[in-house]
Amino acid sequence: MQRRRVNFHTLGCKLNFSESSTLAREFEQGGFVRVAPDAEADICVVNSCSVTEHADKKCRNLIRKIHRRNPAAIIVVTGCYAQLKPQEIASIEGVDLVLSNNDKGELFRRVAALAGKGPAQFTSCDAEELTNFFAAFSSGDRTRAFLKVQDGCDYKCAYCTIHYARGASRNMPIADLVKEAEQIAAAGQREIVITGINTGDFGRTTGERFIDLLRALNEVEGIERYRISSIEPNLLTDEIIAFCASSPKFQHHFHIPLQSGSDSVLARMRRRYTTAKFAERIEAVRRLMPDAFIGIDVIVGFPGETEADFRTTYEFLERLAPAYLHIFPFSERSGTPAVDFPDKVQPSVATRRVEELEELCRRLHGEFCARAEGTTDEVLFESTMRGGMMFGYTGNYRRVKAPYDRSRINTICRVRLGRMDDANDLEGEIVDN
């Protein structure tokens, strides 16, 4: 008897990828064969994102594409878009089941109970009912795993639907997360990215502290590198910074959301810090880790953002000189306070501001990578091969390429860094360990 086939289509954040990977393992343990997203399948699972209107549109288009390619397949949609607008998704041709984030852990059981295609079924719940914690970590990548430690957010920023899509901040106990990290190590992966919706807010459920989680994970044998996927500036404490600086396992790599370099815009966004506080946190990182990779999120075109506000943001970022910028044009989301804010910014103006910051990002990232030319660093090489080259990352997230050598995959090598190419990749020459 031929085993049933399932594929996964994951949109959005690292948390979604960790959850999709866990769901896929359940299907495989239940007798299914996981196939590639573009392969013919009996079950197609879409794990959706809803951070912007563009993300919603991308999900709708993906569902239609899946149905055209696999008209007989059962299509299941879960994730944040499914949580926020289940009926909208259920109305799309080809969709059979829509599951809220609360019911994501029931996905395999619900699919197994379906007799075949039919009228779309959906589950829904309010944000206050989002209390389940779906434990998840990614597998399959030979080098890096994403470990979900926290879910939900209590911040309710003026532009954001995450609280409604993910519920209140909650977490797994440290002891359980250590066991999951040990499973990852046993599978041969060497790097863990610690991920969540508001990762630094860890501990709301158990009364534990994020710093204590970091210390516990630091003791797991077999894991050689940790990265913190993202942390709010007001939660990036001196204690966390000092620990990351002192631990050989925790990489000098920080992703810190700013959103605007204008204090008046930050206040309207309902963010929990000022630009002075943000700059002070960056300085605290650089005092102990001068060559840390710092990535910053920025939103442009927020209602009321004047040209002067944007110039202030641009100049603030230029002074901070992060290694990378993640730039987003403001996207109006129904149900958020920002929908009713006056002084909307024209899309053409927002687009021009995005382009200006993208140009700044290219310059800053190039400068950050070029500073390593002629130095020696440790690189964890991944299984990716293009044009006879393998690629890997230094601890502070500079990408390095070297001639492919299978024996070096998933190992940390001492590498002499040479010239940087047009993609900001550094040429690497492996030095005997």
Residue ranges and their predicted role:
Residues 1-195, 200-201, 239, 254, ...:
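Proteins enriched for Cys/Gly/acidic motifs involved in redox and nucleic-acid/cofactor modification
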Residues 32-33, 73, 96, 223-224, ...:
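A structural micro-motif
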Residues 45, 80, 107, 194, ...:
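Residue-level signal for inorganic ion chemistry
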Residues 55-57, 168-173, 203-208, 268-271, ...:
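Short, solvent-exposed loop/turn segments at secondary-structure boundaries
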Residues 76, 84-85, 186-307:
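Conserved SAM/AdoMet-binding glycine-rich loop
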Residues 305, 321-322:
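Contiguous mid-protein beta-loop-alpha structural module that forms a pocket-lining wall or clamp
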Residues 340-433:
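Terminal RNA-binding accessory module
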